[in-house]
């Protein structure tokens, strides 16, 4: 079934957006309160710009930019393949945004998924003798729930806060990410919260009934491009899950 955008889709997608962005901090971080800013690599360079603004405001002395290439930046679905890792593209954007010196950045260029963003960055900071007890993670706004669920599973000793660039569901789309693609991403991230928790790749997240119903309706409407294999037979379902 071909996915088409209409008022029903907008309403359902808005519910997913509100859920996924709910963890985002709305007030500026206190200067000097965090050890690092971890920017999760992706195709959206606005994340790197926001990380640079956080650093410029004194949120943390160091930015860790993490990412090799994901499906999209590797050239999937007809998109251009980035010539270098996401972390390097993010670093260039951060420098251009706030003049961040190389001494204030660590580049982690091997992670190909969100779990690796955290595990590889954790190893990198440890190798540099950097103790991380309080940290900011920034990513695309709709990754709020998944970023924190992954952080608590793979870097649990740090206290994490999620920050993202401003704007809502109607503000996020641009020429690079049209509304239809955003809806596919929202649906995919909702599924990942369930599937990845059952695989123990991330911590369980309570998904309200109306959010799960919105997800199911959007899947039925054809928004399935960002879904993953749902086979978790070899990964026991964790306790404490409340997905209906």
Regions found by a protein language model. Give the residues of each.
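A structural signal for short, hydrophobic/glycine-enriched beta-strand patches
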Residues: 1-186, 241-244
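A conserved mid-domain beta-alpha-beta active-site/ligand-binding segment of alpha/beta enzyme cores
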Residues: 175-232
